[in-house]
Amino acid sequence: MLGAECPKPCKGKWPTPPFDPRFPNQNQTRNCYQNFLDYHRCIKTMNRRGKSTQPCEYYFRVYHSLCPISWVQRWKEQIKDGTFAGKI
């Protein structure tokens, strides 16, 4: 399983996330949140199927590039406490 803080290839060059046609506007708040959800859904699904979580790394990199650290920390605390509003 990829670590919640940093997957295996944490070091190195992280390119800017590519354009996502679902979020064409300059404000990338929704893009950040959606990639956070997609990452956690991907991890959950891959673990359930007993497969490698390596494909989930893309979502991890995107949300870590777009989201403020304080948001990510708060969302992780909410997931841990069972109060996160998103559907994972």
Curated annotation (Swiss-Prot):
Keywords: Disulfide bond, Membrane, Mitochondrion, Mitochondrion inner membrane. It comes from the Eukaryota. It is found in: Mitochondrion inner membrane. One of its GO terms (cellular component) is mitochondrial crista. Disulfide bonds join C32-C67, C42-C56. Pathway: Energy metabolism; oxidative phosphorylation. A motif (Cx9C motif) lies at residues 32-42. InterPro entries: COX6B-like (IPR048280), CX6/COA6-like_sf (IPR036549), Cyt_c_oxidase_su6B (IPR003213). It is a peripheral membrane protein. GO terms for biological process: oxidative phosphorylation. A motif (Cx10C motif) lies at residues 56-67. Pfam families: COX6B (PF02297). Its main location: mitochondrion. Component of the cytochrome c oxidase (complex IV, CIV), a multisubunit enzyme composed of 14 subunits. The complex is composed of a catalytic core of 3 subunits MT-CO1, MT-CO2 and MT-CO3, encoded in the mitochondrial DNA, and 11 supernumerary subunits COX4I1 (or COX4I2), COX5A, COX5B, COX6A2 (or COX6A1), COX6B1 (or COX6B2), COX6C, COX7A1 (or COX7A2), COX7B, COX7C, COX8B and NDUFA4, which are encoded in the nuclear genome. This is Cytochrome c oxidase subunit 6B2.
